[in-house]
Design a protein with these regions (language model features):
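Histidine-rich, glycine-flanked metal-binding segment
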Residues: 27-31, 40, 45-85
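Active-site mouth loops of central-metabolism enzymes
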Residues: 104-116, 179-202, 254-256
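Divalent metal-dependent hydrolysis catalytic cores, especially in the metallo-beta-lactamase
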Residues: 118-143, 158-168, 212-223, 254, ...
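Histidine/acidic residue-rich metal-binding segments in metalloenzymes
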Residues: 147, 197-297, 322-340
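Metal-associated gating/positioning segment near the N- to mid-region
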Residues: 82-156, 172, 239, 271
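Bacterial N-terminal signal peptides
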Residues: 4-21
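His/Asp/Glu-enriched, well-ordered alpha-helical/loop segment
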Residues: 250, 323-408
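Histidine/acidic-residue-rich catalytic or RNA/ligand-binding cores of hydrolases
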Residues: 100-102, 145, 174, 225-228, ...
């Protein structure tokens, strides 16, 4: 019932009218399409091919290169002096959050209202060039993200391919347990409690029953940054996390974590989580394990920058900018230690559809554009469990293709200038001529 209500409400909005014609088409009804542009990104090779063409048929890429076969009846789309590249991937989003007081919106807005807003967020992310995402928790909206995912998959509303987690998992008094509110008001947690191994297993099974694709666990609590020193308490032991990872693996699924620093990040790496999100500070041992186990760090710089720029006071802004600079310095150490990276922005508290800023910041803080694009597209596809399906322009891959103004290898800000979006062979954003 919720799925039908959300889909109907979303499609009824005027801003969706221009997109509904795309939903009426099926893969089998579309003729072959040839995308032509001035350039094409070779992700694995870290180079630009010029000119670039992609042949799309039945929602998948048939061929890509400087020139492709032109089957009879194919529709040619000339995208001009732009770069064809795979759709962007964000492995850390919050579709159920929007700019404003995060704690208040989760209390004041009903789950149906937040779900409708989440459909708009999904649309905005897709229009921003993000064709696949990992939603890292509804922050108190339970499993409502499964309705959004399912509506997208059924072609009822526009949005990226989604991996969803439902409510994140947290301890009593932990990171999302309404600790800033008057305890006498008994404000509900934005996460689901699990305080021991037995509760972890029960919650994980319940989350999967409700449709979660993976489990999101808050491994670290409230961060402290004073006099240039960063600290954060762990919330689950390595044994508890390992149990969670094992239980998820039992049904072929994975565990993601919010983990900003030691020792929680070490416990997460030891347990074998799919990625370590935020990763403000990592020990040498943690970095070694991440490198050996191929566990990527997901720095989420954009949310830190946004909070610093929109702080409640000048003093708070100064402190948050100092903490961001600290994280940037730690990021350089992680790069030097060959820690794998993936790209996640933590979008939600800042406007959806603008999170390509994350790639820009990762270059600003030390990565080469080609390496950031590999982190986003190749490592991102692996984190989402869609490796060899998305993240590159190869025969057999899903036709998730965008076109950007400029050359992202020369100027990474090109990824913020998305002119064209195709997902699964369906055009959702047409380039202006």
């Amino acid at each position: 019932m919720l799925l039908r209500a959300v889909a109907a409400a979303a499609i009824a909005l005027p801003s969706f009218f221009s997109l509904t014609s795309a939903f009426a088409q099926t893969d089998s009804e579309r003729s072959p399409v040839i995308l032509h542009a001035g350039r094409l990104l070779d992700v694995e090779g870290g180079r630009i091919i010029s000119p670039g063409e992609v042949l799309v048929e039945n929602g998948r890429i048939v061929e890509a290169g400087t020139s492709v076969a032109h089957p009879a009846g194919a529709h040619i789309m000339d995208l001009g002096d732009r770069t064809l590249m795979p759709g962007l991937i964000d492995v850390h989003v919050h579709l159920f959050l929007h700019p404003g007081a995060e704690d208040l919106q989760t209390v004041e807005e009903s789950v149906p209202q937040r779900t409708i807003l989440a459909t708009l967020a999904a649309r905005d992310d897709l229009m921003g060039g993000f064709t696949a995402e990992r939603d890292m928790g509804t922050e108190g909206a339970g499993s409502a993200d499964t309705a959004v995912r399912n509506a997208i998959n059924q072609g009822l509303i526009p949005g990226p391919r989604l991996r969803v987690s439902g409510n994140a998992v947290d301890i009593l008094g932990g990171h999302e347990d309404a600790i800033r509110f008057n305890p006498e008001q008994h404000v509900l947690s934005n996460a689901t409690y699990a305080n021991n191994v037995d509760q972890l297993i029960e919650v994980i099974r319940e989350q999967f029953k409700e449709g979660a694709d993976f489990i999101k666990i808050y491994e670290t609590g409230h961060d402290t940054f004073r006099d240039g020193k960063f600290s954060t308490p762990y919330q689950y032991t390595e044994e508890q996390l390992a149990t969670a990872v094992k239980e998820a693996a039992r049904v072929g699924k994975k565990v993601g974590v919010h983990a900003t620093g030691e020792p929680g990040t070490l416990y997460a790496a030891q347990a074998g989580v799919e990625a370590i999100d935020h990763a403000d500070q990592l020990s040498d041992e943690t970095m070694r394990l991440m490198r050996e186990k191929n566990i990527p760090a997901v720095p989420t710089f954009t949310i830190s920058e946004y909070f610093a720029d929109h702080a409640a006071s000048p003093a708070a802004g100064t402190r948050l900018h100092e903490q961001l600079a600290f994280h940037a310095a730690q990021f350089k150490k992680q790069l030097a230690a060959a820690v794998p990276m993936a790209v996640g922005s933590d979008v939600g508290p800042f406007p959806h559809g603008t999170q390509a800023r994350e790639l820009v910041l990762m270059v600003q803080y030390g990565m080469k554009p080609a390496d950031v694009l590999k982190a986003d597209l190749l490592n991102g596809a692996r984190v989402l469990g869609w490796e060899n399906q998305i993240g590159d322009l190869k025969p057999g891959y899903l036709a998730d293709v965008i076109a950007v103004d400029g050359d992202p290898l020369q100027d990474i800000t090109a990824v913020q200038k998305v002119a064209f979006v195709m997902k699964g062979g369906v055009v959702f954003k047409k380039a202006a001529q």
